[in-house]
Regions:
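Cell-envelope and extracellular/periplasmic
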Residues: 1-262
Length: 262
């Protein structure tokens, strides 16, 4: 999850932050370029990501639903960095326009079987807290999925396959977008390119608009899976993280959709 505000980009390190640092391979550079192109407004980004976290870990620490075994206090890290950014920009004389956030989160909730209703409830609390504490006016969701072709880690997973878990989180994210006028679809790139295990792929339950032949029929599973792996770092045995080109496309889509939403 990262937050965005209009203004110049800057870099600053904050004490006790447990958030990840940027390694440059992410959606942010293309987002900034495209958002500026579409709106004429410069952008400052506060990166507030931490991989492998369920939505419960991003809740304010005083929330009864907050759950983080390592007590990283991610919400407080996010808001501390954000407020410091505002202070820095104010001091430099920049006029701050829209305050927005972009959220690319959900894979871990797929893994731990977070129910649709609980995800909606917790995401809404994070969203409302960011609005209240930081004055953010709108958020964009990057819809997520899980490892393409993955059925489960063991036979105990097969009764509740990852395909069903992905659908549960997708329904939650779609519901949040549909039922809140201040939450939009940033990008469905990741979800659109996800495919489940072969059995679920070949069933009528799975629909795709990506893995189709010239007649509009589903591709054979092996061909579809090979295509799905083009957008992740599969050659390096990384089947869940997007390639840099895929992340650029996601950043581009989020910027276009946010710009159109005003």
């Amino acid at each position: 999850m990262f937050n965005i505000i209009r203004s110049l980009k800057f870099t600053q390190t904050f004490r006790y932050s447990r958030l990840q640092r940027s390694f440059g391979t992410n959606m942010i550079p293309q987002f900034c370029k495209q958002y500026y192109k579409k709106t004429g407004h410069k952008v400052a980004v506060i990166l507030a990501a931490n991989g492998g976290e369920p939505i419960s870990a991003f809740l304010p620490s005083e929330s009864k639903k907050y759950k983080d075994n390592e007590n990283k206090h991610l919400y407080e890290c996010m808001t501390t960095k954000y407020k410091a950014a505002i202070k820095y920009l104010d001091k430099k004389g920049y006029k701050i326009g829209r305050k927005l956030y972009v959220c690319a989160q959900g894979c871990q909730d797929v893994a731990i079987k977070t129910p649709t209703s609980k995800y909606i409830e917790m995401f809404t609390e994070v969203h409302s807290s960011l609005k209240k504490d930081l004055g953010i006016t709108k958020g964009a969701i990057v819809e997520t999925a899980y490892i393409s072709g993955f059925l489960g880690f063991s036979s105990s997973d097969y009764s509740y396959p990852y395909f069903k878990r992905v659908q549960n989180i997708h329904k939650a994210q779609e519901s949040l977008i549909k039922n809140n006028n201040d939450i939009i679809l940033g990008s469905s790139f990741i979800y659109d390119r996800y495919i489940p295990d072969q059995s679920n792929y070949e069933s009528n339950k799975f629909k795709t608009k990506i893995y189709l032949n010239s007649k509009g029929k589903k591709l054979p599973y092996d061909k579809a899976l090979a295509r799905a792996r083009y957008v992740v770092c599969y050659p390096t045995k990384n089947s869940i993280h997007m390639t840099s080109s895929a992340l650029c496309q996601i950043g581009n889509e989020v910027a276009v959709n946010l710009a159109k939403s005003f």
